[in-house]
Design a protein with these regions (language model features):
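A compositional/structural signature for long, glycine/proline-rich flexible linkers
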Residues: 28-421
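N-terminal Sec-pathway targeting helices
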Residues: 2-21, 28
Length: 421
């Protein structure tokens, strides 16, 4: 072999060895990172947060999440939820995200901001595909101004919530609404405590809602009567600077807002579970539960212009729950299926929500079949997508005439034929 070939051969060998070393180091680095990335972090000493109030509040929030996950896991194992534990974990994390935004990031009533409850991926407390819910924290120590534009929304309603002194539950203390067919003459709503609203006759233009001493939340709801129309409504809230008042707190501390985050998270998931358990006792019948847990208080946000009906379903694969009712005289109505945690079912499983204008009505009455399999031809159908257990939410908006619908289980083709005669 010539010297030239030996030189080139040695060069190739050096290149091969170098590449092998690079590959070895890269693989070792990957494995080290993979190992460290999957290593479980050791739990801290239980006393780590004992000497600091904010740390205690932070630890309480994490403890609440862990406890809720353990309860959700147990409920999934017993079949109580009809869902896998993974689905319940997704719900809890969605609720946590909303709780943090609502009570921590935007939880200061001296500088309020609206939280869009069902923004993006989040679903909780009986969401509806046709509605939008926004809330902001308020305090009677301040006056507020709401500026809004209904956009293409067909309905916009505002509710002030305070605390019922007898029960401790949320109470709708004042409210108003607008319909697109009779639009507002002004785009300003003032929120004022009773003493400031009567101090002067020099009132600015717009509408006014009164704040009681225990007022804590303002909720704005918008509805689209046509699902093809996107909700482009806009609303903002600010402290009324023309009426300076002595504030209770210039800003809520992180400790306080963390505590409020934990409270809202706990009350909401426990309240949702309480409702599901209560209605499960009368599944497939729409009867009033004989008993409701005090935990139900966590989801009680009454709306003066909505009436609600429905209950739970618990169906075998070959069964249907058939709802019979009188079509209400209302501005809007809908029937929506939800899971154990009051989350509307995904459209990907099939039609799981119907507006009144989508429901076939015969002689002033409607009939809706709920189940995994299609009903007889020409009948209204809501698909469970194979979900055995869940909730049926029927809402009538601004109803002037209504009656409570009924429900019964149909289990065979013969019975199906009998039901439609």
């Amino acid at each position: 072999m010539s010297a030239g070939w030996r030189l080139r051969g040695n060069s190739r060998l050096r290149v091969i060895v170098g590449l092998a070393l690079i590959a070895t180091v890269t693989y070792a680095s990957y494995q080290a990172g993979r190992f460290s990335g999957t290593t479980v972090i050791t739990a801290p000493d239980e006393a780590w947060a004992s000497n600091d109030a904010s740390s205690q509040a932070f630890d309480n929030l994490l403890t609440s999440l862990s406890f809720a996950a353990s309860e959700a896991y147990s409920a999934s194992q017993t079949g109580e939820t009809g869902l896998s534990s993974d689905k319940s974990y997704e719900y809890l994390l969605e609720l946590l995200a909303a709780s943090i935004e609502m009570q921590l990031s935007k939880g200061d009533p001296s500088a309020p901001e609206f939280t869009d409850w069902m923004s993006g991926y989040r679903k909780f407390l009986g969401d509806s595909p046709d509605a939008r819910y926004l809330t902001a924290p308020i305090d009677s120590a301040y006056d507020y101004e709401l500026t809004f534009d209904m956009g293409d929304a067909d309905y916009l309603g505002v509710v002030i919530y305070d605390t019922n002194p007898l029960t401790g539950w949320n109470r709708a203390s004042d409210s108003l609404y607008f319909l697109a067919e009779n639009p507002p003459r002004e785009n300003l709503i003032r929120l004022a405590s009773r003493d400031t609203s009567t101090q002067t006759n020099d009132q600015p233009s717009g509408y006014e809602l009164q704040l009681s001493k225990t007022a804590h939340t303002v909720m704005v709801r918008t509805y689209r009567f046509n699902a093809a129309v996107e909700d482009n409504s806009r609303i903002a809230i600010s402290v009324d600077q023309t009426r300076p008042r002595e504030p209770v707190d210039d800003a809520l501390s992180v400790e306080r807002r963390l505590a409020n985050t934990t409270r809202f998270f706990n009350e909401t998931w426990r309240g949702s579970r309480a409702l599901a358990r209560a209605t499960a006792s009368t599944a497939n019948a729409f009867d009033q539960p004989a008993e409701v847990s005090p935990d139900f208080v966590g989801i009680f946000y009454p709306t003066p212009d909505n009436s609600y009906h429905g209950g739970a379903f618990d169906l075998a694969p070959h069964e249907h729950l058939v709802i019979n009712g009188k079509a209400p005289d209302s501005a809007f109505w809908s029937v929506t299926l939800q899971n154990h945690w009051m989350q509307s079912l995904e459209p990907s499983i099939g039609q799981a929500s119907l507006r009144g204008d989508e429901i076939t009505v015969r002689d002033g009455r409607y009939r809706i079949w709920i189940g995994a399999l299609p009903p007889p031809e020409g009948e209204n159908w809501l698909s469970t997508g194979g979900l055995q257990q869940g909730l049926v939410a029927i809402r009538y908006l601004l109803a002037t005439s209504e009656e409570a619908p009924t429900a019964r289980v149909i289990s065979t083709k013969h019975s199906m034929d009998e039901a439609i005669r």
